[in-house]
Amino acid sequence: MILYKSEQRVLGRSDCLQILSQAEKDHPDAFERARDYFVAFVDPAAYYKPYPTVAEINAVNSAFTEWVLFDFDFAQATAAERAGEPLPEAPQTLVEAYAQGDATVEELARTQFFSTFWVIAQDPKRKLSVMRETRTCRDFEVSCDLISTRRNWTSGTVNARIASVGGRWVSCGRCLSHDSAPSEPQPACMTQTDPERESSRFIELVRELEGVNGRFVATARAESFWPA
């Protein structure tokens, strides 16, 4: 495990709430379109229950927050409001649009991705885990209190969003889920291949976990949290 001399700032709850609040104020129509798309695509099972639990509603809200911050193409959604202005060459997420020159947020927005990992090793004292991405077999040393302390997560796989902040990989998403189905880790790959960012990967998993017709909705034990 690597020791770091000082903590790097992580995009926290207050940062995210500030971005969401400002975006909704600046672009209410685009924000509403994002919400409508998310609800139509996921079709949350909680919305069909007469008395959903607070945890069920929080799970839906947490998933929407993570998706709209990190995966939703905000530039395309606001194109009509900026008639005559050229669109960015690549999709621009909400967190990228509102980084506002903050180097930490810009780095996080540029490097973040959501994927599936094997948890290879845990160090609870340092809140660090070695996580092997299942598609590239690349190892990441990730700072996350929750992942480092869940001993049973060394079996099966974990779905998480991570990003590099100041050269250190951190858990940056609001939603984590653990799949307990047996899965044997593949050998680590020595090449530093960057996992391909797929903006649909997160929302598709949310539909399976929380959607009314989701494959795992009956047995899902998803957790949502904000990094400290």
Task: Write out the residue ranges for each language-model feature.
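Mixed-charge, low-complexity intrinsically disordered regions
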Residues: M1-D123, C137, L146-A228
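Short aromatic-glycine-enriched beta-strand elements
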Residues: K125-M131
